[in-house]
C-alpha cells in the first residue's frame, strides 16, 4: 500500500466514510479499522473516549497510515483537540455553516449521547454560527444508531420506520417544524432513505461531504486497496459484525485483532 489513509470508529458508521472517500479518490489505499472492542463510542465518558482515540491513532500510525480520519462525530467534537498526534488526524463535524448558507431556519443536530450532552458541542455550535445558535437544536439519536448496529434497519423495516417517525415527531413537538437535520453520527446516513420517505420536505446534511473535500491534500495515488482490521470483545465479536456486513453485501479483506 502506498501511503494509506486510515479511517476508523467503533464499527459500521465509518464504512460510510470509506465508501465516500473511495468514490472520490478511487486510487487511494485505505486502512479501515472497525474498533468493535471499544463499541459504542457514544456511551463512553469523555476521558474514556480520549484514551480510546489516542490508542487507536497510535496503533494506526504503527500500521503505516500516512494520515488518519476519525470517522465519528462524537470524539471529533469532544476529544480530538485534546489528543497527542492530533496533527495527523482529521475529524468529522456537523456542517452548520452549510445549513446557514442554505438559509435554513430550524435545524436539528442528531448524534450519539456523549456528543449531544457535551458542553463541547454547544461551544462548537456557538463558534460556527454565532448569534444564529438559537435555531440549532440537539437530540440524542442513540436509539436510531442501535437500529443500524443491530441490522434491524434492514431486517425489520416496519419497526425501523415506526421508530424514526416517533423520533421525528418527538423532535418537532419539542422544537417546532423542522426544515433541516444534520446526520451527525456516521451511522445515520445508512437510514437516510427512511428520513426522505417520512419527511421529504426536510433537507438532510451528511458531514461526510465536507470531510471528503477536506482530505484532498492528504490523498495519494496507490492501488485502490482497502485493508480492514476488526477488533473484538466478548460482547461485540468480529463474527457478529461480519454478519451485519454480509447483510449489507459488504465484503472485506480483513484481519481480526
Segments and roles (model prediction):
Residues 1-257:
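Non-catalytic structural scaffold of enzyme domains
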Amino acid at each position: 500500500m502506498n501511503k494509506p489513509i486510515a479511517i476508523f470508529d467503533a464499527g459500521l458508521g465509518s464504512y460510510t466514510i470509506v465508501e465516500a472517500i473511495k468514490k472520490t479518490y478511487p486510487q487511494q489505499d485505505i486502512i479501515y479499522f472497525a474498533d468493535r472492542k471499544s463499541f459504542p463510542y457514544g456511551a463512553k465518558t469523555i476521558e474514556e473516549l480520549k484514551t480510546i482515540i489516542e490508542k487507536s491513532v497510535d496503533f494506526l500510525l504503527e500500521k503505516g497510515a500516512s494520515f488518519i480520519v476519525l470517522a465519528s462525530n462524537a470524539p471529533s467534537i469532544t476529544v480530538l483537540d485534546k489528543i497527542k498526534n492530533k496533527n495527523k488526524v482529521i475529524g468529522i463535524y456537523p456542517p452548520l455553516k452549510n445549513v446557514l448558507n442554505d438559509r435554513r431556519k430550524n435545524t436539528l443536530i442528531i448524534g450519539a449521547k456523549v456528543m449531544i450532552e457535551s458542553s463541547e458541542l454547544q461551544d462548537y455550535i456557538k463558534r460556527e454560527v454565532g448569534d444564529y445558535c438559537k435555531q440549532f437544536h440537539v437530540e440524542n439519536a442513540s436509539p436510531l444508531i442501535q437500529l443500524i448496529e443491530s441490522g434491524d434497519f434492514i431486517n425489520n423495516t416496519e419497526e425501523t420506520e415506526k421508530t424514526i417517525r416517533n423520533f421525528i415527531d418527538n423532535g418537532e413537538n419539542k422544537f417546532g417544524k423542522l426544515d433541516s437535520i444534520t446526520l451527525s453520527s456516521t451511522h445515520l446516513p445508512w437510514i437516510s432513505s427512511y428520513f426522505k420517505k417520512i419527511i421529504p420536505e426536510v433537507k438532510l446534511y451528511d458531514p461526510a461531504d465536507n470531510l471528503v473535500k477536506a482530505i484532498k491534500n492528504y490523498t495519494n495515488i496507490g492501488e485502490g486497496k482497502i485493508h480492514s482490521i476488526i477488533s473484538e470483545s466478548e460482547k461485540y465479536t468480529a463474527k457478529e459484525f461480519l454478519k451485519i456486513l454480509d447483510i449489507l453485501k459488504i465484503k472485506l479483506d480483513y484481519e481480526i485483532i
